[in-house]
Amino acid sequence: MKKTIMSFVAVAALSTTAFGAHASAKEITVQKGDTLWGISQKNGVNLKDLKEWNKLTSDKIIAGEKLTISSEETTTTGQYTIKAGDTLSKIAQKFGTTVNNLKVWNNLSSDMIYAGSTLSVKGQATAANTATENAQTNAPQAAPKQEAVQKEQPKQEAVQQQPKQETKAEAETSVNTEEKAVQSNTNNQEASKELTVTATAYTANDGGISGVTATGIDLNKNPNAKVIAVDPNVIPLGSKVYVEGYGEATAADTGGAIKGNKIDVFVPSKSDASNWGVKTVSVKVLN
C-alpha cells in the first residue's frame, strides 16, 4: 500500500511539471564573513548563476544585503545546469532518460561533464523524492555514485576496493609530503582539464588587499597555503589543480586582472613573488 501511494505522488508531481519549469526562489541576508562562493556552495547553486540572479559584476558582497537564491532546475526548453558532484548517470536517472540519450542530445563523445555547463535533458525532473527512490530500486544497473564531475576510472575503483594497498604517500597528512606525492604521480593522473596559462605571483598584502581569499582562506594565518587566483569561467573556484613549477594547489581566489588563461600563484614573501616573475606554465584541473 505504501509503494502504491508513493508512486501516485510521483506521477502527480510529474503531471504538474510536464509542460513548464519547476522553480522556486528564496532570499537570504549576507552575514559577516560570508563569501559569494561559500553561499553558492551552501545552497547548491552555480557561482555564475548566483551573480546573474543578483546582477553582480564582481564577487564583492556586504554584510546585511539581501541575495536571491533560485533553485530552478530546468526551463521549458529542457535545459539543466550541471552542479558539482553530478554525473551523466545521475542526471539521466533524475530526468527519466538514459546516458546514451543525453550524449546524443548534447553531442558528447565521452562521459566527461563540467559543473556550470548546461545540458539538454528533453524533460522535467520529478518533484517527489519517492519517485527517485523507486527509480533507484528498479534500476540496479545504474552507474555507481561518483563524488566529482569526472570520467570514471578503473584504476580508481581498484584503489577503492583495496584500501589496504594505499601507498605511504597517500597515507601522509603533512602538506609537504602530499605535495611531493602529487609531483611524482601527476603524470599518472587523468586530469579533467589541462590548459596552458600565464602565471604571475602575489602575496597576502599586495595592493592593500585584506589577505582573505574569495573562498574565505586567511592567507596571513596560512602563509604556506598553496592557493591560486583564477578566472572562475575558466577554472571553477574550489578546484584542485596541479601547476607546473608550483605543485598541487586550490583555486580559491579571484582577481580583477585575472581573466581568461591567466593565474596568480600565492607565495609567502615579496622576494618569492619577484623570483617567480611571469611564466607560461601548464595547469591540470584534477577535479
UniProtKB/Swiss-Prot annotation:
Low complexity bias: start-end ranges: 130-143
SUPFAM superfamilies, A to Z: Barwin-like endoglucanases, LysM domain
GO biological process, one term: peptidoglycan turnover
GO cellular component: extracellular region; outer membrane
Localization per record: Secreted, Cell wall
InterPro entries: 3D_dom (IPR010611), LysM_dom (IPR018392), LysM_dom_sf (IPR036779), Resuscitation_pf_RpfB (IPR051933), RlpA-like_sf (IPR036908)
Predominant place of localization: secreted
Keywords per UniProt: Cell wall, Repeat, Secreted, Signal
Entry GO MF terms: hydrolase activity, hydrolyzing O-glycosyl compounds
Disordered, as annotated region: 130-193
Entry protein name: Cell wall-binding protein YocH
